[in-house]
From Swiss-Prot:
Belongs to the TOP6B family. It is an enzyme of class 5 (isomerase). One of its GO terms (biological process) is DNA topological change. This is Type 2 DNA topoisomerase 6 subunit B. CDD domains: HATPase_TopVIB-like (cd16933), TopoIIB_Trans (cd00823). ATP binds at N48, D80, S101, R102, G111, Q112, Q113, G114, I115, G116, I117, S118, K435. Homodimer. Heterotetramer of two Top6A and two Top6B chains. Pfam families: HATPase_c, Top6b_C, Topo-VIb_trans. The gene is top6B. It catalyses: ATP-dependent breakage, passage and rejoining of double-stranded DNA. Keywords: ATP-binding, DNA-binding, Isomerase, Nucleotide-binding, Topoisomerase. Relaxes both positive and negative superturns and exhibits a strong decatenase activity.
Length: 621
């Protein structure tokens, strides 16, 4: 009886394809709601476009267009100027899950599993019942190949519904068009616009255009023409390798001896290190790796831990860099202060990684709300599961009050700030297949903590400086109200002209004094002398701008001249130690008394206005 039941059960047992599995478990890949399904689709297509362009050395120019095709349906069109895809590969790239080129590559990349874009194709055919349209071209002399595809979920193979050649204006690139059940939302952090804005910040070399369903066009311009440093593929590192993985490597290696196997299968193992590992494991360097079993593999794992092996190389990573993080934040935010920090590469379980942080503060950011945390992994925004991410946990564990931000009740601080956190690695440890959050790996959390504290210290310094400038400003307002009245009264008593009070104000405030004196000569020319005196206690480096509608003669020292239409901007670079003075002089021809009295204000670039008396001032970048 029991045998009969077992036989009956056996009849119902069969294997399923990976496509069938994801068909029934689409939420695993981020297709669990209408708004999120659209964001996931755009994310996967944009990731592919950026990766393809970077691998080909092409500055990315990406178009994302969303059209409403029904009450609950949208059509998504994503187009790029990448290298294109050869004809034979198009069906498999878009309509076969777990098909890709990066799964076994140990280097930083946005996508690895070969699931993303084909999962979007699967979701589109499940919810709208329509095929996905692909157009791709590999060069100006080559035809554009057009496909209409669906996925056969029983076999995880592409069903080709249409295959033809078409004309396309682009010299090279790829376009994908999908119709699906989804919702386009605006005005919140988890939206297409915010996702693309975040993508533009950490990919400042890309130009991204969004055309919304209402026809509104939003362009995220590139901030640099410099391509990211390409990530180089590396061999596995012995640290953190698992027993089963090592046994598989031993079984399938082409090497016939253990020592060469170690040298050429792992990074940072040379001849001497390989011999040390063999000695520590008690294994003969000449033994055939294929003859080693589980017991010997375990000995090798133990030897890896005993022998000092150099950390893996970091050229497999492509960090954004502090300068480009600054440019990205500056381009997409309107703030008063930006600080950045890039940590040195570190290692977890043999995987190199690097942490980068940017902090933007002030401007029109809300003061009474929690700061905005922008999370990224390998230059890809993470929009969901913020509370379950190591980046958020690191932010919450910092005592922000000592850096100038309120933290009522602990957790994420409150204030007008955006905190950008980027983790780049050959293997980012996500908490799930949907890649929404990074796992709590202690060494990664430590690096995030150190990077955040670095920018937080810079923020503290900035806020302290702003507080001091505010006090100076308030003091100067009082002085400039009182001194003129005193000067007028004293001048009346002594029956003399009212003196210039700027030198007195500068001396009391400890400011930089800039004073221009013009003397008319009998021949119609005029001599101009600009005196600069530093009454402060610090050395200053700055520029003095004199903007005039005429050329000058005999300038000492010689300024840099910038033509501005019919006017000229004369610029002197000056360094002034505490208590020192500088003199600038020049002559102008044929001026009337009226013209001499209408000189524009001198401008000091490089110092806050609170530190300068007698001229306009701006800090600059």
């Amino acid at each position: 009886m029991e045998f009969t039941i077992a036989e009956e059960l056996a009849k119902n047992q069969k294997s399923i394809s990976v496509a069938e599995f994801f068909e029934k478990n689409r939420q695993i890949l981020g297709f669990d709601s209408a708004p999120r399904s659209l964001i996931t689709t755009v994310k996967e297509a944009v990731d592919n476009a950026l990766d393809a362009c970077e691998e080909a050395g092409i500055l990315p120019d990406i178009l994302v267009q969303i059209e409403r095709t029904g009450q609950d349906y949208v059509t998504v069109i994503i187009e790029d100027n990448g290298p294109g895809i050869i004809k034979e590969q198009i069906p498999k790239v878009f309509a076969k899950l777990l098909y890709g080129s990066r799964f076994h590559a140990l280097k930083q990349s946005r996508g690895q599993q070969g699931i993303g874009i084909s999962a979007a194709v699967l979701y589109a055919q499940m919810t709208a019942g329509k095929q996905t349209k692909i157009l791709s071209k590999t060069g100006s002399g080559n035809p554009a190949h057009y496909y209409e595809l669906m996925i056969n979920t029983s076999t995880n193979e592409p069903d080709i519904l249409k295959d033809e050649i078409r004309d396309w204006f682009r010299p090279h690139g790829t376009q994908i068009e999908l119709e699906m059940k989804a919702a386009y939302v605006k005005g919140r952090r988890q939206s297409i616009s915010e996702y693309l804005k975040a993508t533009a910040i950490v990919n400042p070399h890309a130009r991204i255009t969004l055309i919304e369903p209402d026809g509104n066009e939003e362009v995220f311009e590139r901030a640099t023409d410099k391509m990211p440093k390409p990530a180089e593929e590396i061999l596995p590192h012995p640290e953190g390798i698992e027993l089963g993985t090592l046994m598989k490597m031993l079984h399938y290696t082409e090497r016939q001896k253990l020592a060469p196997f170690l040298r050429y299968s792992f990074c940072k193992i040379g001849l001497l290190t390989a011999e040390e590992i063999c000695k520590a494991s008690g294994l003969d360097p000449e033994i055939d790796p294929h003859a080693l079993g589980r017991h010997e593999a375990r000995k090798l794992i133990e030897a890896f831990e005993k022998v000092k092996i150099m950390s893996p190389p970091t050229d497999c990573l492509s960090p954004i860099g502090e300068e480009l993080i600054y440019r990205g934040l500056e381009k997409e935010t309107n703030v008063d202060f930006i600080a950045t920090s890039t940590r040195k590469p570190a290692v977890y379980s043999g995987n190199p990684f690097v942490v980068e942080v940017g902090l933007a503060y002030g401007g029109k950011l809300p003061k009474e709300e929690k700061i905005s945390i922008m999370r990224f992994a390998n230059r890809v925004p993470l929009l969901y599961q913020q509370g379950g991410c190591v980046t958020t946990h690191a932010v919450e564990d910092i005592k922000w009050k000592q850096y100038g931000l309120n933290q009522p009740g602990g957790g994420v601080p409150v204030g007008p700030a955006i905190l950008l956190i980027h983790v780049a690695s050959i293997n980012v440890p996500f908490t799930s297949e949907s890649k929404d959050a990074i796992a709590d790996i202690p060494v990664i959390k430590d690096e995030i903590d150190l990077a955040i504290k670095d920018v937080a210290r810079k923020l503290k310094h900035y806020l302290s400086k702003q507080s001091n400038l505010k006090k100076r400003r308030e003091k100067e307002i009082i002085i400039t109200k009182v001194l003129p009245k005193m000067a007028v009264k004293v001048a009346n008593i002594l029956e003399k002209d009212v003196p210039d009070i700027n030198p007195v104000v500068a001396k009391i405030m400890g400011n930089l004094l800039v004073h221009r004196k013009v003397k008319r000569n009998e021949d119609g020319t005029a001599d101009v002398v600009i005196k600069v005196k530093n009454f402060g206690t610090s050395a200053y480096a700055f520029k003095v701008h004199e903007m005039l509608p005429c050329t000058i003669l005999g300038a000492k020292p010689e300024p840099k001249v910038v033509t501005l239409g019919n006017d000229y901007d004369y610029v002197w670079d000056i360094s002034a130690a505490a208590g020192s003075s500088k003199v600038l002089s020049y002559r102008i021809e044929s001026t009337t008394d009226k013209e001499l009295g209408t000189f524009p204000d001198l401008v000091v670039e490089g110092l806050e206005e609170e530190l300068v008396t007698g001229a306009k001032a701006f800090k600059g970048v």
